[in-house]
Structures are given as C-alpha cells and as structure tokens.
Amino acid sequence: MRRKTEIALAVLTLVFALVHLVGEFALHSTRGQFLPFLWLHCGADLLLVCAAVRMLRGPGAVGLACGAWGLAFGLSATWFFQAALRLMENRAPASAEMDLTLWGLAFLAAGLGFGVSLSLSWRRAPLP
C-alpha cells in the first residue's frame, strides 16, 4: 500500500510540476513577471521533478519529495494571499478573480502533496 501511495504521489508531483511550469511561463510572457521569481519557481519545479523521478525508480525519496512539496506549498501560499490582498484592496487587474482561483487550486494541490509526502516520510518504526 505504501509503494502504491508513493507512485501516486510521484505522478501527482509530475503533473503539478508540468502544469505549474507552463503556468509560470504563461504568466511571465503575458504579464512580465519579475525574473528572479520565475527562476525560483523553475527551481522548485526542477526539485519536484527530481523527487518524482526518484520515487518512481524506487522507494526512499519521500524526504526529498516532502521538501520539494513544502517549497511549492510556501510559494503558492505566498502568491495566493498576495492575490487575495490585491483583490480586497481593489488594486487588482480585471482578471484577478480568475488568478485567485488558479492560485487557490495550486495552493490546495501543493497542500495535498505536502501533506501526503509528510505522512509518508513519518517514521513508522518504533524507537529503540
């Protein structure tokens, strides 16, 4: 059961990284995102892909996946709450509600991945 959960998490990780990377490049090309943020998100996606590939090759990379999902969770939380703040202060563009919805979905997906990877990395053996 644990191995099947790792494989499902690896597939979720690959899908999330691909969707996130495409979304970041679309955001950068349409709205001119700050370039260091783009590199930071690309680094997080690279870390997610490395963790997913390691999990698909064999067990034992759940800690790496947990760190990668934690980084993705932090980044998506930051962007989600910044978009919500801009929307509440009425200084958001016309597409702000759609952006907030997309960031909310990314926030939920990253939270799910982080929670599953954290529960998989929890030590199950009794301490001596």
Identify the residue ranges that each predicted region occupies.
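Cytosolic juxtamembrane helix and N-cap/initiation of the first transmembrane helix
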Residues: 1-17, 116-128
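Juxtamembrane loop-transmembrane helix junctions in multi-pass integral membrane proteins
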Residues: 1-8, 29-35, 56-63, 91-94
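Alpha-helical transmembrane segments of multi-pass integral membrane proteins
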Residues: 8-20, 70-78, 105-113
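Hydrophobic transmembrane helix segments
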Residues: 9-46, 77
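Interfacial non-cytosolic loop connecting adjacent transmembrane helices
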Residues: 25-38, 76-104
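Alpha-helical transmembrane segments in multipass membrane proteins, preferentially the mid-helix core
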Residues: 46-55, 113-118
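Loop-to-transmembrane helix junctions at the membrane interface
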Residues: 51-75
